[in-house]
Amino acid sequence: LETGGSVNYNYKDADIISKQASETFVSSATSSFKNAQNANRNKTTSLTADFRIEWKPDTMTTVIFRPRLTYVKNDNRSATNSFTFSQDPEHTTDEILSAADNLSSLIPEENIVNTIARNSLQKGDNFNVGGSAMVNRRLGKPGRNITFRGSYNYTNSSSEQFSVSETDYYQKTEEERLEILNRYISTPTLNYNYGARFTYSEPIFKGGFLQFSYYFQYKRSKSDNSTYTMPNDWEIAQGYGGDNVGVLDEKNSKSAQYTYYNHQADVSLRWIREKMSLNAGVSFQPQKSKLSYKKDQLDTVAVRNVFNFTPTFDFRYKFS
């Protein structure tokens, strides 16, 4: 019995602040000026564990098992302040930021197009567990063996996005001037698949082997995206739930589920000699997929069946 493995832990914390002052030429006679600051704080924590177990109960049998586990947690925050002007503000971004609460005291109001203040938080968890196994058994005669290979993978992830945005259009009427858009988006995702392959190899003459193989795979993926419009006085720190709930935005919410059934059966002949090699066979691949999709008034199910037939022939000869 042989065992081995590794465990890795990683933590990243990035704090980035960027400032910009730009001019965009709208036409040959007019320009648009923009000053902005972006502040981002991104944190990532991850844990990965891999193991390998090999067991040989006798000289004819080999068993290998490779389990693995991964966990990742993200926390990404950003704050953006941008200011757009019809004339050169003639002030630095820092000076404009300092006067943001009373910007017209620094720059004539007729030169201010709009100001945008936006804060966002995206946090998520991703848990993955999977593994593979292989069992090989030699059956007496050299070259005769049977092999089983299996794999499994399961992923469960969730993502939450919180955002508050306030845009002030200085040149609009008092009723139209302020635009507030607060949103909460939840996106849980579930993926899992498993597969199994059986292979049998039979020697039929010197250097020649006949091989039979069958493979089956099942995959399923489900994702729900729910978008909520939150009240104007809502703040990110309040979170979502309890008294802090919003109105479901059906046009921007959707759910999708994919299901796959894949089969593959192979028959092949391999003949290997000192100066030549021959590989000929045929593969049959029936497949079925199903999609269930919902968005707003759309609720649909699509099923697809495919059958692939693939013959192969490969002959090589060494002349020297």
Over which residues does each language-model region extend?
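Primarily recognizes Gram-negative and organellar outer-membrane beta-barrels
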Residues: 1-320
